[in-house]
A protein has these predicted regions:
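Periplasmic N-terminal accessory/gating domains of Gram-negative outer-membrane beta-barrel systems
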Residues: 1-72, 103-109, 117-123
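Extracytoplasmic loops and strand-loop junctions of Gram-negative outer membrane beta-barrel proteins
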Residues: 29-30, 49-50, 99-108, 156-162, ...
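Surface-exposed strand-loop-strand hairpins of Gram-negative outer-membrane beta-barrel proteins
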Residues: 89-116
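Transmembrane beta-barrel wall of Gram-negative outer-membrane proteins
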Residues: 111-199, 219-240
Length: 243
């Protein structure tokens, strides 16, 4: 639904009635119920999309549920690096719309819109104690910048030019998972991540194609930290306990 942040509707309910889980921890947007906590794709191991008939632990949704697990360490050390670069110079120039059947002043100006992004991911996983204690970790430095004109709503002409940028330590994603196989029937797992982002917004005057003085600014805080501790125990052939 493009009107609600391009979030997905599935399972027969609205976009605000889905739920998202990572390693059993609910990471749905708690303020609005829209979307999930942002995590780099490289951090994931498996995905499940449930649209009905799921157990009580997924009962906080009337729509669908996205259930995911992250990668874990194994008995072999593995390392990886991924670099993604999206320069604004490769984007097509936006259009300009004018009032009075194209003969009037500028109503919408997308020619100044731009987006650039640099995304680097480093990960490592392996045994801290062979067959017993395993670690997997990932860090993701991110650098983004976007500019656009803005008019308040779809019926108002553009009267502002905005620049939004996010970089540095306040925009570093990190995540990790620690698994302790106490014995073949009992496992203790600790999982944590931070997807905090501080976006610096600067607002400038805009009038009929001309960008003026800076008139406002703000720091937009997004994301945060999450962590969980879970236990899985096989008590008998017919009884498994998770907590």
């Amino acid at each position: 639904d493009s009107a609600l942040g391009n979030t997905a509707s599935f399972g027969g309910s609205s976009v605000a009635e889905n739920a998202c889980y990572i390693n059993g921890l609910e990471v749905t947007n708690t303020r609005q119920g829209l979307g999930c906590g942002e995590v780099p794709f490289e951090f994931y191991d498996q995905f499940q999309v449930k649209t009905g008939g799921y157990s009580a632990k997924f009962g906080r949704a009337t729509g669908g549920t996205i259930n995911t697990t992250t990668k874990s360490g194994t008995n072999e050390w593995e390392f990886a690096a991924v670099v993604q670069f999206q320069p604004d110079s490769l984007q097509e120039e936006g259009s300009i719309s004018r009032g009075n059947n194209g003969a009037g002043q500028i109503f919408r100006d997308e020619s100044l819109d731009s987006d650039s992004k640099t995304d680097v991911t480093f990960s490592a996983g392996g045994p801290l104690i062979e067959d017993t204690l395993f670690f997997y970790g990932l860090i993701n430095p991110r650098d983004t910048e976007s500019t656009y004109t803005w008019g308040g709503d779809e019926f108002s002409p553009n009267d502002q030019y905005r620049n939004e940028s996010a970089s540095g330590g306040d925009n570093l994603f990190w995540g990790g998972k620690l698994d302790w196989d106490i014995n073949e029937n009992h496992r203790l797992s600790y999982f944590a991540y931070s997807n905090r982002r501080d976006i610096e917004r600067s607002v400038y005057e805009y009038d009929n194609g001309a960008v003026g003085d800076r008139i406002d600014g703000a720091i937009l805080k997004r994301g945060g930290e999450a962590q969980s501790l879970s236990y899985t125990g096989v008590l008998t052939e017919n009884l498994v306990v998770t907590a």
